Amino acid sequence: GHVPCGKDGRKCGYHADCCNCCLSGICKPSTSWTGCSTSTVQLTR
């Protein structure tokens, strides 16, 4: 499944695509970046 994420509402299919919507609401390319979490919301492939 895909979920809308970030200010632009981009659809993301993987954690790595868009993190989990960081505090600023901006999609980031890596879940390892500061401010991003993979445990809060589990996106499905």
Curated annotation (Swiss-Prot):
GO terms for cellular component: extracellular region. Expressed by the venom duct. InterPro entries: Conotoxin-I_CS, Toxin_19. Gene3D superfamilies: 4.10.40.80. It comes from the Eukaryota. The keyword Aminoacyl-tRNA synthetase does not apply. Keywords: D-amino acid, Disulfide bond, Ion channel impairing toxin, Neurotoxin, Secreted, Toxin, Voltage-gated sodium channel impairing toxin. This is Iota-conotoxin-like R11.10. The lineage of its organism: Eukaryota, Metazoa, Spiralia, Lophotrochozoa, Mollusca.
